[in-house]
Amino acid sequence: MTAEPNKPCQIKRDYPQLINLYPATADTDAHYLSKLSIYQQRVFEAHSQQKLLVLGQIGLSNGLELLSWWRAHSHLSQRLLLKVFEPNPINAYELKLLWDQSACLTKEPELEPLAQRLLHAEPAAIIGCQRLIFDDGRFTIDLHFGDIQSQLSSLIHSPMHPVQHWLILPHLLQALHHQSHWQMAKLSDDSATIATIGLSESSGLSETTVNRFQACGFTVSDINELGIHQPVTLINHQPDAVLLHERQVLRQQDAKAYAFNPMAAILSSATQSSIAIIGGGLASAHLALSLAERGQGAQVFCKDAELGQGASGNRQGAIYPLLTPENDELSRFFQQAFLFSRRRVQALTSAPADNQTPISHVFCGVLQTAHDERSQLRLDKIIQGQPWPSEIAYAVDAEQANAIAKINLDKPGFFYPLGGWVCPFEYADAAIQKAMQLADVSVSLNTDILAIERQSDGWVLLTEKERLGPFAQLVLANGAELTQFDASNKLQISPFRGQVSHVPAQFQLSQLATVLCANGYLTPSHQGLHCLGASYVKEPKHLDFCPQEQQENLAKMHESYPKQSWLEDIDMSGNNARVGVRMVTRDHFPMMGCAPDVPKIIKDYAQHQLTKESRHYWQTTPAPVHQGLYILGGLGSRGLSSGPLAAECLAAQLCGEPIPLDKATLCKLNPNRMWLRKLLKGKAL
């Protein structure tokens, strides 16, 4: 785990408190893990022909069940997605304390290496879903922290890859409400079953509990009663048709309530479909990687001679979450996304040296400070607005800030200990190289797509000299050129020029040990240079070097840290800088999902305007889209944090798999949201 200077204790609860919240089932039955292993073997045998197996687990306990699934799956070629629902969020530090104090891993030495990999992934005590990907996508964990009913009901049903089986840890059997049973049923395959371990009547496996699950169409089995020679067929069952209909009604209610947020129908076999991606930066590279982990190939078309020549071309970029005082959907999304991106960097750089593309990065933390009275009020609101997990961020006084930065700032701030800086173009290149190792992914450089056309058999891409395709699915992930095509030119997104200054590392300045974020940002040195930026010019007329913006970048640092002697070490005389364009949305969410058919939306609006009936129409009618066309962009100035998770979610959508975001956040990411937000409120376009 990352070491943070002067960090407060990340362990908020002592061992007795933790063991009470996360009781270990194995402590009450010495043969529990052996019985669990038999059950897991039966499950894998019953679904050996599936390329992806989705399983649900209620309760994290001390994590041994999760590690046991990982161990049991390690020799299999199929992919496993394990969705774990735990009401009490826990971080890596407290999880390690549980393991150390209980010595549970000493009894299961095979689990120790897996446990260390889980800790290295730094699960955080945040509400919502955290996706952890291991073994090149073969084993994926979705950690859903928070109220179980809320987490279950926030998810959409995945008809192609529903939950096949549920394991419920005994200490949470009684905590599940009848509504939770039905939400589990909504997310499940028709033949899905429930397993638990009936240690005693007090564990909750009573006749009443069993009857409640059966009333939702489940059969319930006790792992204690599952013999090693039990036939595989007993794992599956077919529930009553009436109960299946009730499940379908729940799914239809969801679909109707979120019809304005279309999730286009996926081809029945995603691995047989052809996918084209236009763009050569972080978004397209990570989409290719997420698809490749699913065995899905793609063709990437980049107009430049190398990848990462657009907004992804900077030498260094800060990686840290965007937080709000309310911890709203934007804030929660960025926490999930930031942690996901951080894990991506770790995974790509921990591969064997001969199988790895280097990514320059240092997780040195990010220190946010105010630069005037208004920004101080805003920062104070964020700090005081929530009991932020200290692995996400914590307040520091001026003395602590100086110690973290290794240069004098003399002002308090908010420190993001898991943050740092990453080289964006190396990050994009490493993702593409990994994708090409895993699946049939190709990259066509110097290929400028001038137009796209929809045909009956897919999308055709036009260059100056040739027609490419058709492709069943086309993703526009082309950064500043996102709106260049007729089908995307109405997207409500704006280009902003950003000039990043490169200044030599010298004297006191070279001692900077963390990323500073105030009015602008300043990175620690990399290859003898610091990055100082960035300007923010809407709809720029040119991308040439601008001396005025260079001086403005310097002035921002003087405003942020006035009268500090190290400011004199910032030498701008070399006029060394890089200019890029980032695409920004008004609400700061990226755009991810089906490309909206804006002319059709406007045409329908003419027929359904400003009445109660029209609001109902837009709420319950699938919003118009360009079939087979998708958008991935609008990453703004925080693409390093948001881009990889947005790409992962789009890859899941393209392949018909469970998406690691809740319904409300998916609506916030939808490229049609600016229009539909008004229409759902009965406002004029």
Swiss-Prot record:
What would be an example GO MF term here?
oxidoreductase activity, acting on the CH-NH group of donors
Query: Which residues form each disulfide bond in the chain?
Result: none
Annotated compartments: Cytoplasm
GO terms for biological process, alphabetical: methylation; tRNA wobble uridine modification
Does the entry feature the keyword Repressor, yes or no? no
Residues covered by region (FAD-dependent cmnm(5)s(2)U34 oxidoreductase): 278-685
- Output the InterPro entries linked to this UniProt entry: FAD-dep_OxRdtase, FAD/NAD-bd_sf, SAM-dependent_MTases_sf, tRNA_MAMT_biosynth_bifunc_MnmC, tRNA_S-uridine_synth_MnmC_C
Annotated SUPFAM superfamilies: FAD/NAD(P)-binding domain
Look up the record and name the cofactor or cofactors this protein needs: FAD
Principal subcellular localisation of the protein: cytoplasm
State the GO CC annotations: cytoplasm
Region (tRNA (mnm(5)s(2)U34)-methyltransferase): which ranges?
Answer: 1-272
Q: Which UniProt keywords apply?
A: Cytoplasm, FAD, Flavoprotein, Methyltransferase, Multifunctional enzyme, Oxidoreductase, S-adenosyl-L-methionine, Transferase, tRNA processing
- NCBIfam families reported for this sequence: MnmC_Cterm
- Please state what the protein is called: tRNA 5-methylaminomethyl-2-thiouridine biosynthesis bifunctional protein MnmC
* Protein source organism: Shewanella baltica (strain OS185)
